[in-house]
């Protein structure tokens, strides 16, 4: 019987889907940025979210609270994690802002009309835990890089996957997008 008490896992490593794009809309914990207005406004990093009249305490704490994706690794092996601030289609550096998009005629304010806020990212990392053991990997970010990639070997099983960016002021914010590819074939 369906229930919200049971976490739904996103499968990684299935032969039918060797590449999976995870979006912050599916974060567990805190208040996930569930639309493009929130992504553009850097929800999870900013101390104030001007897009809402009342700010939930969770919004401020999100970056430190450890938002994650619940994933299930189907096949063990080496996986590549590509962390992004902006979607692939935007093709913008991790640290860049985005201009506001054009209005949509005949509609209320479109999400794309919100300017994309830059986040001063200096490094990126991945935390992954299988509820017993944790793995942590962190790398520096190039100023003009649209993404950062890192690889980890994983065994089949259930995990909490928490890719993140670290800012020059020492704050962390979850990676808004994470493209997982794998496992590598020999």
Regions found by a protein language model. Give the residues of each.
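Extracytoplasmic
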Residues: 1-186
């Amino acid at each position: 019987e369906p229930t919200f008490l049971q976490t739904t896992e996103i499968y990684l490593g299935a032969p039918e889907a060797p590449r999976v794009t995870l979006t912050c809309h599916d974060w567990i914990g805190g208040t996930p940025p569930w639309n493009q207005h929130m992504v553009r406004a850097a929800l999870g990093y900013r101390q104030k979210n001007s897009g809402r009249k009342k700010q939930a305490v969770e919004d401020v704490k999100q970056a430190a609270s450890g938002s994650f994706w619940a994933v299930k690794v189907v096949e063990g092996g080496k996986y590549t994690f590509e962390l992004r601030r902006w979607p692939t289609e935007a093709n913008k550096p991790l640290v860049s802002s985005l201009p506001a998009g054009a209005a949509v005629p005949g509609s209320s304010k479109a999400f794309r009309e919100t300017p994309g806020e830059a986040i001063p990212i200096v490094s990126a990392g991945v935390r992954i835990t299988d509820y017993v053991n944790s793995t942590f990997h962190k790398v520096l970010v190039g100023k003009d890089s649209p993404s950062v990639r890192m690889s980890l070997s994983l065994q089949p099983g259930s995990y909490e996957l928490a890719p993140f960016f670290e800012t020059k002021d020492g704050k962390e914010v979850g990676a808004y997008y994470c493209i997982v590819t794998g496992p590598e074939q020999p």
